[in-house]
Amino acid sequence: MFHRIEEALEDLKQGKVVIVCDDENRENEGDFIALAEYITPETINFMITHGRGLVCVPITEGYAERLQLEPMVSHNTDSHHTAFTVSIDHVSTTTGISAHERATTIQELLNPASKGTDFNRPGHIFPLIAKEGGVLRRAGHTEAAVDLAKLCGAEPAGVICEIINEDGTMARVPDLIECAKQFDIKMITIEDLIAYRRHHETLVTREVEITLPTDFGTFHAIGYSNSLDTKEHIALVKGDISIGEPVLVRVHSECLTGDVFGSHRCDCGPQLHAALAQIEREGKGVLLYMRQEGRGIGLLNKLRAYKLQEEGFDTVEANEKLGFPADLRDYGIGAQILKDLGLQSLRLLTNNPRKIAGLQGYDLEVVERVPLQMPAKEENKSYLQTKVNKLGHLLNL
């Protein structure tokens, strides 16, 4: 149904149009997208004839500043905060509305010699400012267009047009599939574009390294930041992990209540301590401490989930009642940190098969699963049983 991102990039580089779909829980629509650098009157005419939506030009903040393109409104109340600037026509155009003149305006917008005074305002081309970070920060068509342009090595600007059915309704995925077939156009999703970027781009930065003496032994601690969010992660390294043999690794998600306060609701604290002790005994290994509190939902939402558990919901049902998946964690950032440490082959301390699949999806080889089972407590027996029954954890209870 959907094409690979690589296929879409090849078509875009040839000046072709692609269809990009967003999430069904967001706008749930598809846009025609082309590279602004290769725009032609024929492409504009195709978009307005078969797309029927508004032709917009996603650009970076740099373009907007250079051409003095102010926001369309001072107070943006759009539900998705689409960053429209004032609309423009190039001064060489007449009405500015024809396919030829709209293409001219777009071409001149990209001209490095153009100045703000070279454009009349308002006009018939609608620039949109993409957020820095692209779809990794905002999963919109604006950011998708600029990201695709960058991935093609083109000027960071696109041309987009919403796809509307002949009866005036918004085209949804079944309609978009037929459209793609009719015009032999590649169709991709923003979700796949996000995954592609996460897989192919380096998103972590090694910030600081120290020696950390602990109750379990002395470790080499390395602090990491990442470009996706403000979360900071830490890797505790023991011994020489540069040797080619598989390395014992624990990827541990932060649990303030368990790790720090010794909560009996979970087994996180004992798992953390046992992993550190086991790595120390082996004399070589890595404990990666990820700031993914509450399986990714955050501390306050975890406490809200606990409240629901007190009312009879299990850990999975509580997450879902709060509007979250059972497990919101993504292992891409953790995988990049492990790769930065030079690891390729792992002996993974885990009871969670999803964690194995998550890391292997980023080209890390898990050669062995090393169980990390703690004695159950009266207060967490039900929690652990739910992890077995609903999350597939490998525990002997």
UniProtKB/Swiss-Prot annotation:
Pathway: Cofactor biosynthesis; riboflavin biosynthesis; 2-hydroxy-3-oxobutyl phosphate from D-ribulose 5-phosphate: step 1/1; Cofactor biosynthesis; riboflavin biosynthesis; 5-amino-6-(D-ribitylamino)uracil from GTP: step 1/4
Residues binding GTP, per UniProt: R250, V251, H252, S253, E254, Q271, E293, G294, R295, T315, T350, K355
Record region (GTP cyclohydrolase II): 200-397
Pfam families: DHBP_synthase (PF00926), GTP_cyclohydro2 (PF00925)
Residues the entry annotates as binding Mg(2+) 1: E27
Active site, per annotation: D327 (proton acceptor), R329 (nucleophile)
Cofactor(s) needed: Mg(2+); Mn(2+); Zn(2+)
InterPro entries from the UniProt entry: DHBP_synth_RibB-like_a/b_dom (IPR017945), DHBP_synthase_RibB (IPR000422), GTP_cyclohydro_II (IPR032677), RibA (IPR000926), RibA-like_sf (IPR036144), Riboflavin_synth_RibBA (IPR016299)
Binding site residues for D-ribulose 5-phosphate: R26, E27, D31, R138, A139, G140, H141, T142, E162
Protein family (similarity comment): In the N-terminal section; belongs to the DHBP synthase family.
NCBIfam families named in the record: PRK00393.1, PRK09311.1, ribA, ribB
Biological role: Catalyzes the conversion of D-ribulose 5-phosphate to formate and 3,4-dihydroxy-2-butanone 4-phosphate. Catalyzes the conversion of GTP to 2,5-diamino-6-ribosylamino-4(3H)-pyrimidinone 5'-phosphate (DARP), formate and pyrophosphate.
The protein's name in its UniProt record: Riboflavin biosynthesis protein RibBA
Protein's organism: Bacillus cereus (strain G9842)
Lineage: Bacteria, Bacillati, Bacillota, Bacilli, Bacillales
Primary gene name: ribBA
